[in-house]
UniProtKB/Swiss-Prot annotation:
Name the UniProt record assigns to this protein: Large ribosomal subunit protein uL11
Function: Forms part of the ribosomal stalk which helps the ribosome interact with GTP-bound translation factors.
Keyword field: Methylation, Ribonucleoprotein, Ribosomal protein, RNA-binding, rRNA-binding
InterPro entries, A to Z: Ribosomal_uL11, Ribosomal_uL11_bac-typ, Ribosomal_uL11_C, Ribosomal_uL11_C_sf, Ribosomal_uL11_CS, Ribosomal_uL11_N, Ribosomal_uL11_N_sf
Originating species: Pseudomonas putida (strain ATCC 47054 / DSM 6125 / CFBP 8728 / NCIMB 11950 / KT2440)
Pfam families reported in the protein's UniProt record: Ribosomal_L11 (PF00298), Ribosomal_L11_N (PF03946)
Length: 143
């Protein structure tokens, strides 16, 4: 018989840097999950990713206090800011442009995000990422 699911916890944790401090500790502690076990497993799974990039994770907590988790790819906004060399997007994206990204950069981001996107092919994924870039106040070249 399958285990009974108690809760789903969604967090963004920096790759390779999970530790028991907030937000990880309180979120897992209130469901009775072994926090250090999660931190070690998460850090091991995200070892190949660039350290410090926020990684969305969905933790499934079962009634016997065991857990499983699934990591997603880094949010597109973080990858776009990194590609454009910015610390934040524009406060007024339709009037004030703060940077530029090229189609090649968008293709790299789309390839990294393709597993999490619902796009049918790479070109559709690039257009999706380009829309995110425009909404952040970035100029998009070549799309």
């Amino acid at each position: 018989m399958a285990k009974k699911i108690q809760a789903y916890i969604k967090l963004q944790v920096k790759a390779g840097q999970a530790n028991p401090s907030p937000p990880v500790g309180p979120a897992l502690g209130q469901h009775g999950v072994n926090i250090m076990e999660f931190c070690k497993a998460f850090n091991a799974r995200t070892q190949g990713q660039e350290a410090g990039l926020p990684t969305p994770v969905i933790i499934t907590v079962y009634s016997d206090r065991s857990f499983t988790f699934e990591t997603k790819s880094t949010p597109a906004s973080v990858l776009l800011k990194k590609a454009a060399g910015l610390t934040s997007g524009s406060a007024r994206p339709n009037t004030v442009k703060v940077g530029t990204v090229t189609r090649a950069q968008l293709e790299d981001i789309a390839k990294a995000k393709q597993a999490d996107l619902t796009a049918a092919d790479l070109d559709a994924a690039v257009r999706t990422i380009a829309g995110s870039a425009r909404s952040m106040g970035l100029n998009v070249e070549g799309v």
